[in-house]
Amino acid sequence: MASSNGGIVGVDNPPVAQPAVITTFNSSGTLTTAPYTTTAQYVIVAGGGAGGANGNGSGGGGAGGYRASVPGEASGGGASAESLASVSGATGYPIVVGAGGAGTTSDGARGSVSSFNSVVSTGGGGGSFVGPEKPGGSGGGASYSTSGGSGTSGQGFNGGASKYNGGSNNGGGGGGGASEVGTSCPTPALPQRGYPGGDGVASSITGSSVTRAGGGGSCGRFENAVIGAGGAGGGAAGANPVSSTANAGTANTGGGGGGEDGANGTGTGGAGGSGVVIIKEPDAGYRVSGVWDMNALYDNVKAGTWV
């Protein structure tokens, strides 16, 4: 029997439109989806790794892992966009935004993870002071003739290798970025020279193109060393040894921190930049009057409210 809602059979069901919704999280929180959302695009960037220090050519910090599901764009490590996240409408989802790794007087600390709906981006690897490479979302740059840290598949690239020839001919490797490997010190090493971090990945999920997850630059040895540039996307440049603290990665980009030479033994590597999580709920279209899903039909018939 037709009800009084314009001749439509069933419970009152007014038309509704749900436009696209974009939410940016610069710190951890909760995403509450719009009522008719069923899928979501995302860009999830972890915290960047800190640069190394006092290593006679310390490595730059690796960028935080970069994962994205924006159609037509890239994820990190040369991967294509991931599948859209499946979500439910009017539901809360925890968002974790990773902190950047802290700068120290030796190996840079690794960045922290960022996550949404079981999608986790790995923190960037710290830049090396001495010894083994530091893996991460993107790997940290090396120091003292070691290979750069390895990046995580689908998130970022390796850090650059270093070379130690004694004297001033030492150079750390640049931190890996989301779109390219950190630059390695050549053999033989050039005098007093640092090397750039790898570039990050650009996304237009917010409507404007922004590059994130660049690796930190390394440094050479001694006061006149040429510093390595930070990778595009928040990576910090390496520091000259006369600076007591190296440059930090840009906040909310997951950029790696810069390496600090520390010929005086007291320097501190640059901190990694914090991460970011961006969620886009696509336009859900126009829900017309007189259309119900099967759950609504069942619930109303069971309750005796279907007319």
Q: Which residue ranges define each predicted feature?
A:
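Low-complexity, glycine/proline-biased repetitive segments and flexible coils/loops
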Residues: A2-T30, Y36-M294
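Intrinsically disordered, compositionally biased repeat/linker segments
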Residues: M1, M294-V307
